[in-house]
Amino acid sequence: MLNTKNKFMKTILFISTITLLLSCSNSQNSNSTISIDLDASKSISINNIFSKMEIIPLETNEKSIIQNIDKIIEYQSFIYILDRRQKAVLIFDSHGKFISKINTIGRAPDEFYLLEDIVINRFANTLECLDPMGKILTYSLQGQYQSSIYLPHPPMAYHYLHILNQDSILLYTNPTKYNDYTFRIFSRQQDTFVSQFMKQKKIINGECRQPIQVYKDSIYFTQAFSNEIYKISNDTLLPAYQWDFGKYTYNLSKMKFPDLTNPEEQIKFYKEVMYSSKIPYTLGFNSQNDRYLFCSLFMKNKILNILYDKTTKRKVVFSKSKEDIGLYPLYMDNNKIIGITDETLVPLEPLENTQNIEIIKKEIIYTLTDYSNPILIKYIFK
């Protein structure tokens, strides 16, 4: 079975001497600051937040095997899983039945060299896949190839995309010393960039799952090592809100770093600094819906989940519930959070023994092996 903990650590702990986006002008402040006492973590009942949970084993066969889950999208009764390691998108129905796999590697128009991101184009009702080498491939919702777009160079690579409208595509490039800009807007009609924005400065950088989020047609941007959440407006990043974790809050711009291009210095940095009092957490996942602001902090040996009720201002901080149920989030919308099981962080057994749980295809649960596909959990909000 997929080792999600090791996968996460490899992703989030990747540190290099690249860059972090500059903060907006010092004169600009966030519209709101949410102060959270991380020491106030409580083992609340999972039923206080969620009306029910669904356990969905993903079908395992020769074609559907998943190596890593890098992104999940749920759309129109389909579940789309990006697996960067095997350069594939796997499509399942809402009950975990395997539908199809996109895995056409090559240089032809209907092929890709790598896969870095996927999104749903709601204007055309299609799936868009990003080859970081400069190509966007369009597929039907069932995975049939339709067309390709070739992107300009520079930059050397692209890492995330979002469909702004029928014509415009927002593209994000991980900062490096060779890049001027992090964000670009590409016009399909003009076949070129119509805007480039946000410069950077050298510092360390890590990866937050789904750094680009959409809520009510607004686009938000999150970084693993920053509590500041930005809203993308036209060709500008504006502070939207920020998390304040009190004594645990840190500021990379005020830290001194060794030469992280040196392997020995990297190893030392991992051992002595990451998940220590200097950098006690990374922002692993951040999102929102009509009711909640939500984030997950990845700390040493645990995930700390934070829910902030926009209306009541109530704050919930928990690692595991009273029922010993954890939450490893990969997707969130107005109705639910989708996560996965994990041997250490979110074991399956407490889920099976709790109330308000629905197990899809229960017979599969009893035949799982180390080679079985991951198990998804839908946490349905009250």
Show where each model-derived region lies.
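C-terminal motif of bacterial Sec signal peptides marking the signal peptidase cleavage site
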Residues: 22-23
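Blade/loop signatures of beta-propeller domains
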Residues: 28-59
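Short beta-strand elements that form the blades of beta-propeller/WD-repeat-like
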Residues: 35, 78-83, 125-131, 167-175, ...
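Beta-strand-rich domains and repeat architectures in extracellular enzymes and scaffolds
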Residues: 54-87, 282-285
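Blade-loop segments of beta-propeller domains
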Residues: 59-63, 97-124, 131
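Repeated scaffold domains used in trafficking and secretory/extracellular systems
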Residues: 68-70, 113-118, 155-163, 204-211, ...
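Asp-box/WD-like beta-propeller blade repeats and closely related beta-sheet repeat scaffolds
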Residues: 132-179, 196-201
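Conserved blade-ending motifs and adjacent loop-strand segments that build the rim/top face
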Residues: 242-254, 311-334
